[in-house]
């Protein structure tokens, strides 16, 4: 019943109101375009700020190697070559 009523109303409507005034569509398109540009700029600015904050916080801490110290002895010891007695 309801789909039949909706179909009947759609058939009786002569023309959509938005299609009658194309200038209004152009104005709304321009507003939407500017809105998209503003949102894109704000998003990029936010990403750059977050990245800079992450870099500075990483530089403040010692990073992955906190608590590790260098060994006092060398990894490879040198071999002493001695000639056999004759």
From Swiss-Prot:
Extracellular side: 19-23
Protein name, as recorded: High affinity immunoglobulin epsilon receptor subunit gamma
Stated role: Adapter protein containing an immunoreceptor tyrosine-based activation motif (ITAM) that transduces activation signals from various immunoreceptors. As a component of the high-affinity immunoglobulin E (IgE) receptor, mediates allergic inflammatory signaling in mast cells. As a constitutive component of interleukin-3 receptor complex, selectively mediates interleukin 4/IL4 production by basophils, priming T-cells toward effector T-helper 2 subset. Associates with pattern recognition receptors CLEC4D and CLEC4E to form a functional signaling complex in myeloid cells.
Modified residues (Phosphoserine): 69
Cytoplasmic side: 45-86
Signal peptide: 1-18
One biological process term in Gene Ontology: Fc-epsilon receptor signaling pathway
Subcellular location as annotated: Cell membrane
């Amino acid at each position: 019943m309801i789909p039949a009523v909706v179909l009947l109303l759609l058939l009786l409507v002569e023309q959509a109101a938005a299609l009658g005034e194309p200038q209004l569509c152009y104005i709304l398109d321009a507003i939407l375009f500017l809105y998209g540009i503003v949102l894109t700029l704000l998003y990029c600015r936010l990403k750059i700020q977050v990245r800079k904050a992450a870099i500075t916080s990483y530089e403040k801490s010692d990073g992955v190697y906190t608590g590790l110290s260098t060994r006092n002895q060398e990894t490879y010891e040198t071999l002493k070559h001695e000639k056999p007695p004759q």
